C-alpha cells in the first residue's frame, strides 16, 4: 500500500539500489553475472528467515527481482535456468521494452485473485 513502509518494500529498494550500483560501477557481462549470483546473499544476509517460510525462498525471490530489474525476462518455474542467462543481451546501452510490462513472480505470490484489482487492508505480503 502506498505510504506504508514494509520489509517487502525495503527489500525492493535494496534490489534497485544494488542493481543501480552495479550499472554505475561498470564491468563485463561475466562480472555482472558473478555479482548477480552474490547479491541475494548481500540483500538477505544470515541464516534466519524474516519474510517467507524459508531463507532459500526469500533469496530465490530476490534473485528473480534482480533479473527483472536488470531487464531480463522472468524465468520459467518448470525449467532450470541460470540466474544470469541472457545477461549479455541486457548489458547494452539501449534496451527496449519487452512485454509484459508487469511480471508476477508466481512462487512469491500468496495466491491473491489473478486479474483482479482490489484495494483492501488484507495484504498477503507479496
Model-derived regions, located:
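Ferredoxin-type iron-sulfur electron-transfer modules and their immediate structural context
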Residues: 2-126
Amino acid at each position: 500500500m502506498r505510504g506504508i513502509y514494509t520489509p517487502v518494500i525495503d527489500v525492493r529498494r535494496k534490489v534497485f539500489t544494488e542493481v543501480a550500483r552495479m550499472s554505475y560501477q561498470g564491468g563485463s557481462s561475466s562480472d555482472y553475472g558473478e555479482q548477480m549470483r552474490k547479491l541475494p546473499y548481500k540483500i538477505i544476509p544470515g541464516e534466519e528467515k524474516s519474510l517467507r517460510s524459508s531463507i532459500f525462498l526469500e533469496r530465490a525471490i530476490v534473485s528473480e527481482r534482480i533479473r527483472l530489474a536488470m531487464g531480463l525476462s522472468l524465468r520459467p518455474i518448470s525449467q532450470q535456468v541460470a540466474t544470469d542467462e541472457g545477461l549479455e543481451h541486457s548489458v547494452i546501452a539501449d534496451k527496449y521494452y519487452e512485454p509484459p510490462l508487469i511480471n508476477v513472480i508466481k512462487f512469491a505470490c500468496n495466491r491473491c485473485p489473478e486479474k483482479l484489482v482490489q484495494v483492501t487492508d488484507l495484504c498477503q505480503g507479496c
